[in-house]
Amino acid sequence: MVPVVALVGRPNVGKSTLFNRLTRTRDALVADFPGLTRDRKYGRAEVEGREFICIDTGGIDGTEDGVETRMAEQSLLAIEEADVVLFMVDARAGLMPADEAIAKHLRSREKPTFLVANKTDGLDPDQAVVDFYSLGLGEIYPIAASHGRGVLSLLEHVLLPWMDDVAPQEKVDEDAEYWAQFEAEQNGEEAPEDDFDPQSLPIKLAIVGRPNVGKSTLTNRILGEERVVVYDMPGTTRDSIYIPMERDEREYVLIDTAGVRKRGKITDAVEKFSVIKTLQAIEDANVVLLVIDAREGISDQDLSLLGFILNSGRSLVIVVNKWDGLSQEVKEQVKETLDFRLGFIDFARVHFISALHGSGVGNLFESVREAYDSSTRRVSTAMLTRIMTMAVEDHQPPLVRGRRVKLKYAHAGGYNPPIVVIHGNQVKDLPDSYKRYLMNYFRKSLEVMGTPIRIQFKEGENPYANKRNTLTPTQMRKRKRLMKHIKKSK
């Protein structure tokens, strides 16, 4: 399960700045969900290959009345469901009563908490953080988030050791087989056999969507009609339910995010939908079913979820629920809206179903298997290079500064999602339009459906870069004569 890190603190202590630093390689998801404050930010970050979800909880206004009465509900939820909390304080402003109230609340929750003193630029860090030791949260980590100073140290000395201690796990290098095959083909050898067989593993299927779109009904319909072996297996964290099942002699694991347990004083509105649970389900899944309510249409929340799914590279099947009972005119309007707002998602199958009555539910699994097979299929270097060559023959790369961009060869760089790595000269200057052309050409040639495909470009190295030619004795004498001539002419 992907760990969750919550940024907590008073307003204007630099939480959003640190959030942007941590998620610099990812597009933050801005969510506006019922029961949660507007513009709450969720993003994916990475430290030494270990991914985690980062939450900007917004400002918590702790007062003498007690932090629980003044803390926003979404911030309470984020703290409760986070694995670790980075409690941020303002080193310039010094210790405030609100800081003490928040620290008291965090101590009562017994969450792993690290105290981060921001805005230490221009100050003596040791002197600036002295007052904050009275909060009783242990060591203080000074940073300057706006300039990035101390952020890397925070990641390496705080988050990374914590992630290793709490969730030690061996990360399978899914790209190893591709690189072994590529190197073997380059050396004229046979690639070693890979023991990993995606068909032997169950397909992890996450059902996500806004509240009341029919996720629970769809889950119950799937389990109630076609289950062979079903039992509830609580997830390792945050009560996500993993439900193994079998259909058409194929094993699946449904990741159920519909049931969110009540926690403390969190209201029912917030309880209905946990953004954190949904993001973790997407990260952990092979295929995601995005459920949309046909009667309400596509909302900004749906598009936000869709954006996170695309950034995660997960296979996708779009499910339009509550299709029954709609007039033909309304159905046509819904389809037009889908085409208009989701026209850029040309790789995903769209199913119109009624989870309540079961119509169209059975056809979902055909698209799920298709998407999973597309995302995990192995493709040889020879085939990818051949497809790239055909694409170049059909449409030449543009000229850059009078020279034609040259694409040399392509090989696989990973799967789920499929990654194609293209090597060449001046590839960094390729326009986005040509990159999209190559992506669509590979998708069509490989018949990839249900999963995004990513193209990565690598510049060929100049073998003469940073190297100086050794002059022969004759060249040395000629150079001396030329230098004498130049000096005389001056």
Swiss-Prot record:
GTP 1 binds at residues 9-16, 56-60, 118-121. It comes from the Bacteria. SUPFAM superfamilies: P-loop containing nucleoside triphosphate hydrolases. Keywords: GTP-binding, Nucleotide-binding, Repeat, Ribosome biogenesis. InterPro entries: G_ENGA (IPR031166), GTP-bd (IPR006073), GTPase_Der (IPR016484), KH_dom-like (IPR032859), KH_dom-like_a/b (IPR015946), P-loop_NTPase (IPR027417), Small_GTP-bd (IPR005225). CDD domains: EngA1, EngA2. It holds the Pfam family KH_dom-like. One of its GO terms (molecular function) is GTP binding. One of its GO terms (biological process) is ribosome biogenesis. HAMAP family: GTPase_Der. GTPase that plays an essential role in the late steps of ribosome biogenesis. Belongs to the TRAFAC class TrmE-Era-EngA-EngB-Septin-like GTPase superfamily. EngA (Der) GTPase family. Associates with the 50S ribosomal subunit. This is GTPase Der. It comes from Salmonella paratyphi C (strain RKS4594).
